[in-house]
Amino acid sequence: MKYEGWPDEGELVVGKVDDIEDFGVFVDLEQYQDKRGLVHVSEVASGWIKNVRDHVNEDQTVVAKVLGVDESAQQIDLSLKDVNDHQHSDTIQEWKNEQKADKWLTLAFGEDMADDQFRRIANGLLADFGSLYDGFEQAAIHGHEALADTALEDDEIDAIVETARDNVSVPYVTVTGYVSLQSPDGDGVDTIKDALQAAEGNGEVPDEVDLDVTYVGAPEYRLRVQAPNYKTAESALEAAGDRAVDSVTAHDGSGAFHRERQLDDDA
């Protein structure tokens, strides 16, 4: 997806070197529709430049900083020397991520997706998440909940979530829930302790799952699960809550699993 309009001053943009002259370098902007910028020779690199071609090549992909935009003159002034290695690496990675997300949109809605639908969905994700990639990543981690406040239709959300979970690589996801546990009998402390051990799985939690149980204030305990994907994390979280509740109720206590704290969380 290429943006319509113009880049902002100070923005880092990805471009391809189109033409090299003695006075500077013309760069076609990869993220903007039909936009071209000029890197004056003084902005190609620090120090005296004898030959511009010693620093850039035609068709080279570069990251440039936007120094100024004159829409009336159709002119964009760029700098290569003002971009450090870290900025270059991050900007290229973000650009590649957006290219991936473009393909995911096509996977979600098909090759024959109408241009106006593509723009509407893409603009919706950009408005809420800042980038298409971040929208898909949040959909992969949090599912439908991540897109609930967007202007997308239900069937569009379904398609994005399904595609995200099939294609987005998330190093790990973290989900959190709470259990309220109470036991009125004389052995209540031991009953609660047994319930917490049950929540932790008694050594039966899969190796790919990291489960942590912490006390946050009577009668609530926090369950925090880290796992390689959303489905695994959610399954492990719900199973931990069920184990704790089943254990305490089996000893005439009471328990409940819930997503949010029932009291103010100062922990």
Curated annotation (Swiss-Prot):
Keywords on record: Initiation factor, Protein biosynthesis, RNA-binding
Limits of the S1 motif domain: 10-81
Any GO molecular function: RNA binding
Keyword RNA-binding among UniProt keywords: yes
Superkingdom of the organism of origin: Archaea
InterPro entries for the chain: NA-bd_OB-fold, S1_domain, S1_IF2_alpha, TIF2_asu_arc, TIF2_asu_C, TIF2_asu_middle_sf, TIF_2_asu
Keyword check for Protein biosynthesis: yes
GO BP: translational initiation
Matches recorded under PROSITE patterns: S1
Family that this chain belongs to: Belongs to the eIF-2-alpha family.
PANTHER family for this protein: EUKARYOTIC TRANSLATION INITIATION FACTOR 2 SUBUNIT 1 (PTHR10602:SF0)
Quaternary state and interactors: Heterotrimer composed of an alpha, a beta and a gamma chain.
Function: eIF-2 functions in the early steps of protein synthesis by forming a ternary complex with GTP and initiator tRNA.
The protein, known as: Translation initiation factor 2 subunit alpha
Gene designation per UniProt: eif2a
